[in-house]
């Protein structure tokens, strides 16, 4: 079976071989065969035991579509019927505003398990649902506590999704992600972070609600390849865009010209 050494302290949740056998509902020889072929590589712990990293299991399921017999053993979700992401929006909306974390988790992680990418989950499912929550809140049909609870539920789901993403290589490109002053929206910037992680990047969250001057300082200190800011709430979008250029981008080009930058989010889309 293909073996790799596990480094102590690495963020890489491991599954014992027998638990994987029960989860997939297969015999041990099948798991060993997949390991020998490279489809499901195992790792060796310091004690010499063979285990499989959760991201490797997720990759195997996404590539093969193999059914899951006992998903609860590894915190997975049951194999469901494939359907377009947009057809699940109403169900996710209802689950979030009513605080049904288990159902929300089943939907999002189920799609990922079936092969959907993190960017598509954000663009085609999670983003549209939260825009609808915002519209319904503005119209008085969703209460403040429901909007906040929806964010908490989704953050829990995305935290779970993080466990299934591979750990980036130590020399992978570095990206910084954050939000500007008075913008404390967590879900959009977490999706940006997971999108970069899924592409093999190292990611450092610089924080939420930061002044542009502090974002400039931390960018200079870390020298990333990419700086990503998500702006969901801006009191004066046009004024912010001018300051973004003058206080952040122009000085950054002078001191760190190799740093690329990206600015997005609902507030930016509405301003453009």
Where are these regions (language model features)?
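Residue-level detector of anion-binding/catalytic polar loops
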Residues: 41, 202, 225
